[in-house]
UniProtKB/Swiss-Prot annotation:
Its EC number is 3.5.1.10. Residues 21-102 form the ACT domain. It comes from Bacillus subtilis (strain 168). Gene3D superfamilies: 3.30.70.260, Formyl transferase, N-terminal domain. It catalyses: (6R)-10-formyltetrahydrofolate + H2O = (6S)-5,6,7,8-tetrahydrofolate + formate + H(+). This is Formyltetrahydrofolate deformylase.
Length: 300
C-alpha cells in the first residue's frame, strides 16, 4: 500500500504530465518572445504562463520563463531540446527545459534547531512544496525521530572544522547515492568548503537569520539587539564561497522595538526564517529562479 505522500506526489505527476517549463537568458534584442512562442506553437504547445524581464531594453540582458502544456511532452522532451537548440543559438541563449512531473530530489541539512525543518516538512505534506525529500543529513540527533517517522532516510554525521573535509566527502557520496538535485540548509550551522559548493553551483539554498547584508556571520540576533535595530529579518540565498553573500532569493522583515531583548528577537526571527526559506525552496522547485551575476530574477 502506498504511503499518503507517495500517493500525493503520484497524483501531482499525473495531473502535470503534459506541463513543461522553459527558462531563457540572453542578450536583449527584438524577436525573442516571437521566436520562442512560434517554436512552442509549431510543436503543439499551449502557453499557460509567461513572465519576462530585461535589465535594459538596449544592450541589456533578457530573461524569460514560460510554462506550457504539450501533450506527450515526456516522450517529446529530447526532440524538443534538440529542435530548440537552433533558436537558442540564434539569440545566444542560456536555457533549460524541464518537466513539472519530474520532481526534484531534495536533501535537507539541519543542526539542532528544527523550526525550518518542521516548516519544510509541513509545506511538503500539505502539497505546497512538490518534491521528493530524498534524505535528511544532520550533525545532531535531534531530528531523527521526526524524519524517520515519515520514512525519510536520516543520516547523522558528526561535523566540525577539524574533520570537515572528511565529512563532506562522505556527504557528497550520500548526495550522489540519493541522486539529489537541490540541497537545503535548514539552519545547518556548518560552513561548507569550496569543493562542496562547486559540486552543486546554484543548487544549495541557505537561510540566514538576518536581513542581509546586515549582520553577516554568527549571532546576528545578539548583535542586532546590541545595535538597537527596529527591524529584523531573514534572507534565503544560494550558497557561494563568500560567506552569506550568495545570490538572494527571498527576504522578509518584521518591526521590533526597545522592549524586545535578544531572546525575543530570536523568537520573532524564527517565524520569519521559516516562511522565507519555504518560499525560496518552492520557487526553486518550480523553476522560477534565474541567477544573473550575483543576483536573482524570481518569477513568482
Amino acid at each position: 500500500m502506498k504511503s499518503y505522500m507517495t500517493q500525493r506526489l503520484d497524483e501531482y505527476r499525473d495531473g502535470n504530465e503534459d506541463k513543461g517549463r522553459l527558462l531563457v537568458s540572453c542578450p536583449d534584442q527584438p524577436g525573442i518572445v516571437s521566436a520562442v512562442s512560434a517554436f512552442l506553437f509549431e510543436h503543439g504547445a499551449n502557453i499557460i504562463e509567461s513572465n519576462q524581464y530585461t535589465t535594459d531594453p538596449e544592450g541589456g540582458r533578457f530573461f524569460l520563463r514560460i510554462e506550457f502544456d504539450c501533450a506527450g511532452i515526456r516522450e517529446k522532451k529530447s526532440s524538443l531540446q534538440a529542435a530548440f537548440a537552433s533558436v537558442a543559438e540564434k539569440f545566444d541563449m542560456t536555457w533549460s527545459l524541464t518537466l513539472a512531473s519530474e520532481l526534484k530530489r531534495v536533501a535537507i541539512f539541519v543542526s539542532k534547531e528544527l523550526h525550518c525543518l518542521h516548516e519544510l516538512i509541513w509545506e511538503w505534506q500539505t502539497g505546497n512544496l512538490m518534491a521528493e525529500i530524498a534524505v535528511v543529513i544532520s550533525n545532531h540527533e535531534e531530528a531523527r525521530e521526526l524524519v524517520e517517522r515519515l520514512n525519510i532516510p536520516f543520516h547523522y554525521m558528526k561535523a566540525n572544522k577539524d574533520i570537515r573535509a572528511e565529512v563532506e566527502k562522505k556527504q557528497l557520496e550520500l548526495l550522489e547515492q540519493y541522486d539529489v538535485d537541490v540541497i537545503v540548509l535548514a539552519r545547518y550551522m556548518q560552513i561548507l568548503t569550496p569543493d562542496f559548493v562547486s559540486a552543486h553551483p546554484n543548487r544549495i539554498i541557505n537561510i540566514h537569520h538576518s536581513f542581509l547584508p546586515a549582520f553577516i556571520g554568527a549571532n546576528p540576533y545578539k548583535r542586532a539587539y546590541e545595535r538597537g535595530v527596529k527591524l529584523i529579518g531573514a534572507t534565503s540565498h544560494y550558497v557561494t564561497n563568500d560567506l552569506d553573500e550568495g545570490p538572494i532569493i527571498e527576504q522578509d522583515i518584521e518591526r521590533v522595538d526597545h522592549r524586545d531583548n535578544a531572546e525575543a528577537l530570536k523568537n520573532i526571527g524564527r517565524t520569519i526564517e521559516r516562511s522565507v526559506l519555504a518560499r525560496a525552496v518552492k520557487w526553486h522547485l518550480e523553476d522560477r529562479v534565474i541567477v544573473h551575476e550575483n543576483k536573482t530574477i524570481v518569477f513568482n
